[in-house]
A protein has these predicted regions:
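Actinobacteria-biased recognition of intrinsically disordered, low-complexity terminal regions
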Residues: 1-2, 293-298
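Short beta-strand edge/turn micro-motifs at domain boundaries
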Residues: 263-293
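Short acidic-hydrophobic surface loop/beta-edge motif
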Residues: 105, 242-244, 254
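Hydrophobic pocket/interface hotspot
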Residues: 194, 202, 271
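A short acidic/small-residue loop/turn micro-motif
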Residues: 45, 258-259, 280-283
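Active-site-adjacent scaffolding segments
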Residues: 1-30, 34-36, 40-184, 190-191, ...
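Short beta-strand segments that buttress and anchor functional surface loops
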Residues: 250-257
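A solvent-exposed, acidic/Ser-Thr-rich amphipathic alpha-helical stretch
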Residues: 200-241
């Protein structure tokens, strides 16, 4: 196989790794493109294992980009939420091989937000172990740490993530039903109906990035969240909404004309909504919402 064919064979895995590491489609695409440029300039005779070479290069480029992004986000206005890979109106009814890996791993907005709690090396070590099934020797080579240190990184990451994850997730049917009811209540501005769906200490996290109006701090408490949607409806600022999918996860898609205005996902704990995540920053929203997932996206 020539260099381009080899690279395209491994590209879905590289994109999946870069996206989980960075939580940004644009940044992940840049990292994978940089990996391609380095691969196309490498001497094929000196590369014994192309996949290992590409994964190593992508991991190290991704870590460099993540460190830079963390410094840049100090100046980001309000909460930072992940930029989606795929926003669709319908799920893929028959996932192909390129999606099987993605569907087995969590790329929900909630989980990507949780990953932001980890340091760059912790995040890389955890993902390489848990999402991509590398052993500790391989992880040590990939991120430039000792095996013992990598074990500690993964252990700490597991502890931190476990503390932030719900003990009992809703099944897919319950999750979608709650989301549909939340969409209906929020479109009507029915504060009481919204509060009935939420945990008392629920939070709403909105990402406008300083580009559009959005809360610059998480809104805490079911009553305050209910009042917010009541106020939005009273002002006549409600946008047409329908259920769709973000990274394969059910989501509320709101439109302004033909343009996606925002999307909202939820996290369900013990039968009620614990967290609401809304991305309004137009720089993170696709220009076109497709009907089905692109197989190579996730």
């Amino acid at each position: 196989m020539n260099a381009e064919t080899v690279f395209q064979t491994h590209r879905p895995r590289l994109m999946a790794l870069a996206y989980r590491l960075l939580g940004s489609r644009a940044d992940a695409e840049d990292v994978v493109q940089d990996a391609w440029l380095r691969w196309s300039g490498a001497d094929p005779a000196s590369v014994r294992d192309p996949e290992a070479w590409l994964v190593t290069t992508t991991t190290r480029l991704g870590l460099d980009r993540l460190r830079a992004a963390r410094r840049e986000r100090v100046h980001y206005v309000g909460p930072w939420l992940a930029e989606p890979l795929a926003v669709t109106l319908q799920p893929d009814p028959a996932p192909g091989p390129a999606q099987l890996h993605a569907l087995a791993n969590d790329v929900s907005v909630a989980f990507l937000t949780l990953l932001e709690q980890l340091g760059p090396e912790e995040r890389a070590a955890f993902l390489l172990k848990e999402a991509f099934d590398h052993d500790y020797r391989e992880i040590a080579d990939l991120i430039g740490h000792s095996e013992a240190n990598c074990r500690q990184l993964v252990h700490r990451a597991r502890q931190r993530l476990q503390a932030g994850r719900p003990r009992f997730n809703a099944d897919a049917s319950q999750h979608r039903q709650l989301l549909a009811r939340f969409m209906d209540a929020s479109q009507r501005g029915d504060s009481e109906a919204i509060q009935a769906l939420l945990h008392a200490n629920a939070q709403l996290v909105s990402d406008g990035g300083g580009v559009v109006t959005a809360a610059i701090r998480p809104l805490l408490g079911a009553e305050r969240i209910g009042r917010l949607f009541w106020a939005i409806a009273r002002r006549g600022a409600v946008h047409p909404a329908q259920l769709g999918y973000v990274n394969g996860e059910p989501a509320i898609l709101r439109f302004q004309g033909d343009r996606l205005h925002s999307f909202t996902t939820i996290e369900v704990v013990d039968g009620r909504i614990a967290n609401v995540y809304s991305v309004l920053n137009p720089e993170k929203l696709p220009k076109v919402v497709t009907h089905r997932n692109a197989a190579a996206s996730l």
